[in-house]
Amino acid sequence: MKDNLASSAFDTNFTHQAVDGRTKIVLFGASKAGDYTLRAYLAKGYDILAFSDNNKALHYTKKEGIPILPPDELSRIKFDQIVICSQYWSEIYQQLTGELNVSKDKVIVANSSELKATTFEAPEVMAQARLALRWMLNMFNHSARPYYLDGGTLLGLARSGDLIPWDNDVDLSILQQDADFYSEFLETSLPDLEQYTSCRWTISYLLYEHSGLVWQKGQLRKIVLTNEDFNFSVALIVRYYNAPFYCYSAVSCIFSDHERHFSQNDWLDFYGVKAAVPCHYQSFLDATYGDWRTEVRDWHYTDYKNTDFYKGGKDD
């Protein structure tokens, strides 16, 4: 009886008329990231057949008029590609290519820019991001506590001296022993940041939902400052020590970088303000990105060189 009900629900919901000549796409992930990926793929001219998601509460509902189907119904659709638009891409990839027997050449992961809402390509957002980073650098440089530019922020400064236009957040790292200091420091300094940028900001603390390599459930994963007026964030990632590496977890990955990069720091200039970066930052970038000097707009999480992928506890 259950199978008949599911079949009836599928027949009722899946009424899409394919558009000849267009690549037929299923988007796996019906969260906010799915919204952004939908816009990106519609703009590219793709024919979006359906969403799919593991959240049963969403099954046979619709997003933007597009049906959200259970994963086990995908075999009933003739699609060209499934695009994973979720931070849990590693688990979903294994689910699709293993449990659901989807051909690997039909499964792709949305690149980082497709998963984002606002980017720094908007001049007013770029101006605010630069202003916020300058404030951070000035304040942190006087704190006598270590910090390091990280991720796309470090990559942009090392390559061109500026933020990457298609990025949408500012990334820094701190060490686990300094997490309490920076949490309190930012909490008390938030009014100053709002005055400096003439914007509203909120602060949030993301905790590990599962114990992992060297962190325990409930320990701080990152501090996130969100600009409520221009919809971008500044993230302080907490790195935990697992000799001889400093590590953190995100998007189904464990990122590990050698302790030599954090024993001290180098400096880069950001619009006249000194910015602390990992020691030997060029080799740090080599280990993270490979050929980091060449711009790659369509960057996927699978492209990182300093990660191990895991299946299990889901921490963004």
List the predicted regions and their residue ranges.
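Hydrophobic, well-ordered beta-alpha structural blocks that scaffold small-molecule cofactor pockets
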Residues: 1-78, 83-118
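Short, solvent-exposed loop/turn segments at secondary-structure junctions
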Residues: 30-34, 56-57, 87-90, 153-156, ...
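Catalytic metal-binding acidic patch
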Residues: 161-182, 272
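Helical scaffold of the NTase/Pol beta-like nucleotidyltransferase catalytic core
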Residues: 18-19, 103, 107-149
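Metal-dependent nucleotidyltransferase catalytic core
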Residues: 125-132, 173-215
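Active-site nucleotide-donor binding segment shared across nucleotidyl transfer reactions
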Residues: 39-40, 137-170
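Catalytic cores of NTP-dependent nucleotidyl/adenyl transfer enzymes across multiple folds
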Residues: 227-316
